[in-house]
Amino acid sequence: MALSTSSPLPLYQTPEIDGNTILLKVPWYPSAELEWCWAASAQMLACFFQGSLTDQCKFANLLFSGQDCCASPSACNQPIDLNEVTKLFESFDKSATFLSNPIEFEDIQTEISAGRPVQVGYQWSDQSNHVAVIAGVSQDNVGSLVYVNDPDPQFGNGWVYYSNLRLAYGDGTWQWTWTVNP
């Protein structure tokens, strides 16, 4: 899933909040390879759920059988089919529901409140795809915020308004969602 070359995320590191903030301890990791947003997102989620670090290349090995992505990561530096993302969840003993649409802020709140991060998929304006992880929710006097762990180092992690996330930070649209099954 290609990374965008758009401007940095309009992050709000210290939002004025109303006490309804929930932030899960999902670690942030950058993509080890340009096309590995999916592997970095899986790494974040696996570390959150299992408490141990799995190399991104091992997630690539799961999907590119016959290749040693740890010895030669550039050979595996490619996007994956969206249907393969659920296999990554299974690798850390979770199942996920794939939705071909964004979910409402209230639904994200429900997931985060239950201790389940949400994975989102964007389609950039150039038609390439990208995934990231929502790890928190909050509200300020302007609107609803989500805490995004975006594996693209130019975006990183931080607070962004939900309305801006729906527009893939102004450079596309949020098209897909993966929720972790209880």
Where is each model-derived feature located?
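Sec-dependent, cleavable N-terminal signal peptides
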Residues: 1-2
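Conserved active-site-adjacent core of cysteine acyl-enzyme catalytic domains
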Residues: 8-11, 60-182
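Active-site nucleophile-adjacent alpha helix/oxyanion-hole segment immediately C-terminal to the catalytic cysteine
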Residues: 9-67
